[in-house]
């Protein structure tokens, strides 16, 4: 089959809220997805990406991946990322990379935390009480790209771009009940239970069984109404550069993530793990001192360095030998609710490997598991009452042009069957303080739980 070199691009009138303007009428459609830069004051705030109406969908639940097109539905037990690579390569689109068009059609969606069970042997202790898929990916032959840096709105399509624009502007969202919580947030563990789990982790750490474990608690509330309204509210409150709204058949994912997982561009790999958190303070001088306190914290630096080493090892499994570098170590980045300690790891991917090979080697991200990764994941499955599902997985895209960019789905709400789920955790190391770690879980989600209560 002839390869199509590039999509047709039409430029639409600029408006800074173009992503919300065009997404609102389609947000109710299954497989409508929005990657939003959150209007963040952040280096990675340039693009918003909107898709809907995919040509193919891939849905993984446990061992089965279901591939649906307009004509066929097939079920396979193959490695889900291999299935994804095969489906991408089967489509006749192979554009050249364009720095102004990061996503030129391709795969976009959710890689849930529990997809990691396909790549590592893990226990089956935690309850699977959320019915959403482990992987939910659409393949799209069009997209809307909002470039906030150049103030350009581009609609790209491999077919009739004008017809796609007419389709997009003809959509009308149904009238929805306004969003509201119908119960208070409830944790899946008491303060006493958290303490017991914390001390179990400490025992494993002091015995040398592991070096760091990310222990979380999950908050749940019932709700009614429009999840898109909830996302708009959260987006204004959090302004996170890797935000996303995914509409699935049986629910929605509302992500306000500050963290990049892996980017691949022209063979260059970048990952930016977050490890180390302190809450923002209202007084500017006290807030600057808080940032300096985080920068100087030996505990947080040690915690961060463990994950840097883990990510170097994960990426090194597939990178060109000798190419793994750490250009940034222990950088403090401010966000609306918290200061984070961030490091950057870079490498090169051999031409012989695909973005899915890189994703498989590093999934799930080390910043939300611990070290060593597999042992930490075993402990997480034993101590956390329920599976993580979408939380601590990844949301992102693999473009037909070869570029990949993905987030870590922290600060993320799962909405399904009238219930909201939102988790928060922290990396526990040998000298962690129980009360400080417990409080950190609240510091991380206050900007999510409270806006939804109002």
From Swiss-Prot:
Quaternary state and interactors: Monomer. Heterodimer consisting of two non-identical subunits: a glutamine amidotransferase subunit (PabA) and a aminodeoxychorismate synthase subunit (PabB).
Catalytic activity: chorismate + L-glutamine = 4-amino-4-deoxychorismate + L-glutamate
EC identifiers of the protein: 2.6.1.85
Coiled coil regions in record: none
Homology family: Belongs to the anthranilate synthase component I family.
Biological function: Part of a heterodimeric complex that catalyzes the two-step biosynthesis of 4-amino-4-deoxychorismate (ADC), a precursor of p-aminobenzoate (PABA) and tetrahydrofolate. In the first step, a glutamine amidotransferase (PabA) generates ammonia as a substrate that, along with chorismate, is used in the second step, catalyzed by aminodeoxychorismate synthase (PabB) to produce ADC.
One Gene Ontology term of the molecular function aspect: magnesium ion binding
Active site: 259, 275
Keywords: Folate biosynthesis, Magnesium, Transferase
Organism ancestry: Bacteria, Pseudomonadati, Pseudomonadota, Gammaproteobacteria, Enterobacterales
Protein name: Aminodeoxychorismate synthase component 1
One of the Pfam families matching this protein, by short name: Chorismate_bind
Cofactor(s) the protein requires to work: Mg(2+)
This protein's pathway: Cofactor biosynthesis; tetrahydrofolate biosynthesis; 4-aminobenzoate from chorismate: step 1/2
NCBIfam families in the cross-refs: pabB, PRK15465.1
Protein's GO biological process: folic acid biosynthetic process; L-tryptophan biosynthetic process; tetrahydrofolate biosynthetic process
InterPro entries linked: ADC_synth_comp_1, ADC_synthase, Anth_synth_I-like, Anth_synth_I_N, Chorismate_C
Domain of life: Bacteria
Residues annotated as binding L-tryptophan: 37, 44-47, 241-243
């Amino acid at each position: 089959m002839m390869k199509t070199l590039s999509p047709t691009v039409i430029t639409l009138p600029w408006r800074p809220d173009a992503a919300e303007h065009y997404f609102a009428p389609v947000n109710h459609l299954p497989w409508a997805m929005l990657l939003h830069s959150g209007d963040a004051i952040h280096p990675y705030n340039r693009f918003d990406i909107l898709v809907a109406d995919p040509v193919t969908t891939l849905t993984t639940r446990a061992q089965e991946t279901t591939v649906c097109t307009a004509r066929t539905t097939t079920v396979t037990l193959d490695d889900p990322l291999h299935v994804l690579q095969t489906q991408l390569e089967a489509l006749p689109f192979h554009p050249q990379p364009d720095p102004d068009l990061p996503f030129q059609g391709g795969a976009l969606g959710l890689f849930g935390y529990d997809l990691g069970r396909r790549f590592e042997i893990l226990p089956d202790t935690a309850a699977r009480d959320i019915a959403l898929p482990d992987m939910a990916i659409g393949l799209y032959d069009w997209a809307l790209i909002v470039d906030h840096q150049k103030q350009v709105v581009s609609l790209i399509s491999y077919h009739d771009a004008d017809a796609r624009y007419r389709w997009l502007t003809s959509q009308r969202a149904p009238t929805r009940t306004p969003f509201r919580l119908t119960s208070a947030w409830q944790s899946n563990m008491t303060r006493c239970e958290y303490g017991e789990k914390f001390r179990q982790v400490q025992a494993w750490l002091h015995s040398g069984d592991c070096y760091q474990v990310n222990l979380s608690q999950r908050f749940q509330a019932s709700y009614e109404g429009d999840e898109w309204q909830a996302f708009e509210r959260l987006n204004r409150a959090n302004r996170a550069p890797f935000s996303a709204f995914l509409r699935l058949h049986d629910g929605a994912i509302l992500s306000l993530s500050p963290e990049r997982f892996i980017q691949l561009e022209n063979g260059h790999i970048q990952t930016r793990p977050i490890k180390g958190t302190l809450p923002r303070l209202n007084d500017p001088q006290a807030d600057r001192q808080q940032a300096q306190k985080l920068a100087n914290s030996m505990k947080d630096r040690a915690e961060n360095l463990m994950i840097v080493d883990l990510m170097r090892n994960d990426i090194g499994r597939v990178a060109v030998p000798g190419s793994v570098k750490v250009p940034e170590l222990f950088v403090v980045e401010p966000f609306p609710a918290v200061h984070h300690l961030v490091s950057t790891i870079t490498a090169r991917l051999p031409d012989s490997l695909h973005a899915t090979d890189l994703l498989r080697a590093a999934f799930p991200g080390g910043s939300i598991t611990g070290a060593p990764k597999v042992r930490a994941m075993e402990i997480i499955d034993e101590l956390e009452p329920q599976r993580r599902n979408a939380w601590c997985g990844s949301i992102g895209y693999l473009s037909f042009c070869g570029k990949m960019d993905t987030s870590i789905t922290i600060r993320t709400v799962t909405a399904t069957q009238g219930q909201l789920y939102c988790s928060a955790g922290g990396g526990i190391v040998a000298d962690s303080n129980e009360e400080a770690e417990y409080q950190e879980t609240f510091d991380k989600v206050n900007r999510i739980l409270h806006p939804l209560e109002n």
